[in-house]
């Protein structure tokens, strides 16, 4: 019986406690002049994630999106959204936990952030902006690779 209880404690657990908008900003520094120009924007998306341990097995993950639209060499709009979540995560190895915090949780948060960006852009009366899906697993793998390469370079120096 004690063996069964021990096995249950070791089973991975993942729960979403809360998803919330932590910070939001929308700027149209060149309005109303920007509305008088032909709309042919260059849109740039910057992503960032960070996580913090709040308590035993409880983590906050924040996904930051910054969308900048340039039209005719001027900033049409700048939209920043920080979408956050509180997650209970237990029973994972360190590499599994790092992957969960760096890829799995941001993947959960992204649709909320994408909707917030789309809503803000629409309220600014700009054409609809649909952000493409993001492969957070690939971004996390790239991040891990870069860290390993930097560590190897430091060891060889």
Swiss-Prot record:
Q: Tell me where in or outside the cell this protein is found.
A: Cytoplasm
Q: What InterPro entries does this protein map onto? A: SecB, SecB-like_sf
- One term under GO cellular component: cytoplasm
GO MF, one term, reads: unfolded protein binding
> HAMAP family per the record?
SecB
What the protein does comes down to: One of the proteins required for the normal export of preproteins out of the cell cytoplasm. It is a molecular chaperone that binds to a subset of precursor proteins, maintaining them in a translocation-competent state. It also specifically binds to its receptor SecA.
Which family does the UniProt entry place this protein in? Answer: Belongs to the SecB family.
Q: Which protein are we looking at?
A: Protein-export protein SecB
Q: Which organism is it from?
A: Shewanella oneidensis (strain ATCC 700550 / JCM 31522 / CIP 106686 / LMG 19005 / NCIMB 14063 / MR-1)
